[in-house]
Design a protein with these regions (language model features):
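NAD-dependent ADP-ribosyltransferases
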Residues: 1-222
């Protein structure tokens, strides 16, 4: 039986990973950003995608890629809001709560925990998205980084997308749509991962064990 972490609003960010990494994110605001090239060549099917970095798709295949993929630094998180509903595969149950006269949706994050060994899957749940975004932008300004903002990922079907469509780092194949990503994009002219520190997030986030706790959204979110 999973414990419940109840969220009163339908706008959250979630980062899943190993416990020590998630504690660094919560306590120090450590944002670890890998490059598009890292994601393009990673063999873990939950993380890597050979179509990352694609600029154009023709007949379902990558016909052209962007340059300097090592310079594109990405921070990716799972997200939900009132516009982007939760993927059906992640919904454990939906029920009506008479006492609060609202809908309760239980989300099972174990379906996303293949990012790390199952017993080590922890999640940082960010409840104040606007404040997180403000701190992220501020950290970029302090470090004089070329920040291109954050966007919800647009998922595409490689068999149907037009050859004329120019893809950006905010596009991804629809076979990954359950990840419901929002991406933060920085350009930095070196090949190393980028570490950015936002400061403690304890006032706007919490950490949970994915294998012990389900997310419960109290209110309409579909």
């Amino acid at each position: 039986m999973l414990k419940e972490y109840i969220i009163p609003q339908c706008h959250i960010l979630i980062k899943i990973g190993k416990k020590d990494h998630m504690q660094l994110l919560l306590n120090e605001g450590e944002v670890y950003m890998n490059s598009t090239e890292f994601f393009r060549t990673n063999k873990n099917e939950e993380i890597g995608d050979e179509y990352e970095g694609a600029m154009c798709i023709k007949n379902g295949k990558v016909s052209d890629s962007r340059e300097n993929l090592d310079f594109e630094k990405l921070f990716c998180m799972w997200h939900i809001n009132n516009i982007n509903p939760v993927h059906d595969s992640l919904i454990h149950r939906i029920e009506y709560d008479k006492e609060s006269d609202s809908t309760r949706m239980t989300i099972d994050l174990r379906k996303l925990s293949n990012f790390t060994p199952n017993e080590e899957s922890y999640a940082v749940v960010i409840n104040n998205v606007r404040e997180f975004n403000r701190r992220f932008k501020l950290a970029c300004e302090k470090n004089k980084l070329q920040y291109h903002g954050n966007k919800v990922v647009k998922y595409y079907d490689p068999e149907k997308i037009s050859e004329e469509t120019i893809l950006t780092p905010f596009w991804k194949r629809n076979s990954y749509d359950k990840q419901q990503e929002i991406r933060y994009f920085i350009e930095k002219a070196d090949k190393e991962p980028l570490e950015l520190y936002l400061g403690s997030l304890n006032d706007i986030a919490t950490i949970i064990n994915v294998n012990e706790t389900a997310i419960v959204v109290q209110g309409e979110c579909r």
